[in-house]
Design a protein with these regions (language model features):
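Short, intrinsically disordered terminal segments enriched in charged and Pro/Gly residues
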Residues: 1-45, 89-100
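Short linear motifs in intrinsically disordered
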Residues: 36-40, 63-68, 123-127
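Flanking scaffold residues of small Cys/His-coordinated metal-binding clusters
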Residues: 41-50, 71-72
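Acidic, aromatic-enriched beta-alpha/helix-loop junctions
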Residues: 46-48, 65, 142-145
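Short cysteine-rich clusters marking metal-coordination/redox-active sites
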Residues: 46-53, 77-80
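Short Cys/His-rich zinc-binding micro-motifs
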Residues: 56-58
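Short, compact, well-ordered microdomains
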Residues: 60-96, 163-182
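Positively charged, low-complexity terminal tracts
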Residues: 96-191
């Protein structure tokens, strides 16, 4: 079991070794998923497991639990059962909890591929509300499901389009285009 204090992984120096940086990114993603999704119940996020048993990627997904009132975040891989807790995450840059009440609208469920979900998590220009939608993406059996209102989906599509239009990396451009196409087609079809 990994016991981590998130504050130890914030503001890391540029020369930090790769494994430590990847662990920090993994813990950051877990906190974002746990705070972007429901509190009080364990749910399976679309975040992949980072372990490589036998030099092969673990096919598992991160199951996260954020108790209410806020304390430590529990996480566990659905396949290899790698697990841990993260403390001191409240009010960090990775804390995506809503700060005020919002009006709930009708939700659309959109099926995504692993590649599209990964591209959405890698977006750099997301506001907090869109980041919450992206990190609350769930794995449901073989499906990966993004749940969003029409307004949230419009906002996310606009942000993906803006980033895709300004992307100079030729490897990243097709991933952003695929994410834009998947969201646009699903939105046009009504979710």
């Amino acid at each position: 079991m990994l016991v981590a204090d998130l504050h130890h992984f914030l503001d890391l120096p540029d020369d930090i070794p790769g494994p430590a940086r990847r662990l920090a990114e993994h813990l950051s993603s877990i906190v974002r998923a746990a705070t972007g999704g429901d509190a009080g119940t364990a749910w399976m996020s679309a975040l992949p497991c980072r372990r490589r048993p036998g030099n092969r990627s673990c096919p598992g997904r991160m199951v996260v639990l954020r108790p209410e009132p806020a304390s430590v975040i529990h996480w566990e891989c659905s396949t290899c059962h790698d697990e841990g807790v993260i403390s001191n995450w409240g009010d960090s840059p990775d804390d995506l909890r809503r700060r005020k009440l919002t009006v709930a609208g009708a939700l659309n469920e959109i099926d995504l591929t692993d590649a599209v979900a990964s591209a959405l998590r890698d977006l750099r220009l997301l506001d907090t509300d869109s980041e919450r939608v992206v990190f609350a993406v769930r794995a449901d059996g073989e499906r990966i499901v993004l749940t969003a209102t029409d307004d949230e989906l419009d906002q996310l599509i606009g942000l993906v389009a803006a980033e895709a239009n300004h992307e100079t990396n030729r490897r990243r451009q097709p991933r952003l285009d695929a994410a834009f196409d998947a969201l646009s087609v699903a939105h046009a079809a009504g979710g």
